[in-house]
Amino acid sequence: PCETGCNRNHIDTTINIHAVERYIGDEAINKQWEVKLTAKPTGKRVLIVGAGPGGLSAAYHLKRMGHDVEIYDAGSHPGGLLWTGVPDYRLPKEILDAEINRIVKMGVNIRLNYKVTDILTEKDAGNFDAVYLAIGAQLIHAEEFPQDRSVYITDAFSFFNEVKSNTSPYIQKKVVVYGGGKLALYISRMIKRFGSDA
């Protein structure tokens, strides 16, 4: 949005903010920049439930404010939808892992494969002062489709998980993708890459 209002446009062209952010992000990874923690430790402990974009972002900012931060996530890898719902050609795993590692190096502890079922019990057991819920966008809104045994139906996140875990997903020669958002487009492109018609 700020690019459209950039006064540089009156001279030549607006500043490509996305390209500037990309360059800085690449430099941070390539030169292994570390985040400097300047705030005094508060002695407060915060539990974040969910290691997706929201949870990781909250951990980054809370740690910079001087709080002790732990993240619990039911998944086997941090990143949430960035890990399970964005194809590698859009966001390579190495880049995502590097960004997550920068947060871990700040002193944020991430506990994986751990599902929180009782928030108050976890808060008390871990002596946390606050809990931030960042459970994200993993819920599936399934539609009911009539089908026979020759038709295979799956949801986008299950499909992405199969692809991300390097297991070959079951794909028929002709595939119907139900949906019209970015996720449907990602799925369609991936299906084409596997050699099927979408």
Residues covered by each model-derived region:
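Glycine/serine-rich phosphate-binding loop and adjoining beta1-alpha1 elements at the start
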Residues: 1-38, 104, 112, 122-162
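Glycine-rich FAD pyrophosphate-binding loop
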Residues: 67-83
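Extended interfacial segments that mediate partner engagement and assembly in macromolecular machines
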Residues: 27-65, 82
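Structural signal for hydrophobic packing residues in well-ordered secondary-structure cores
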Residues: 10, 21-28, 63, 78-82, ...
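Rossmann-like dinucleotide/flavin-binding elements
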Residues: 48-72, 112-123, 139-141, 157-198
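N-terminal Rossmann-like dinucleotide/flavin-binding domain of flavoprotein oxidoreductases
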Residues: 20, 81-128
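Catalytic cores of large soluble enzymes that bind and process phosphate-bearing ligands
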Residues: 12-16, 54, 63, 88-95, ...
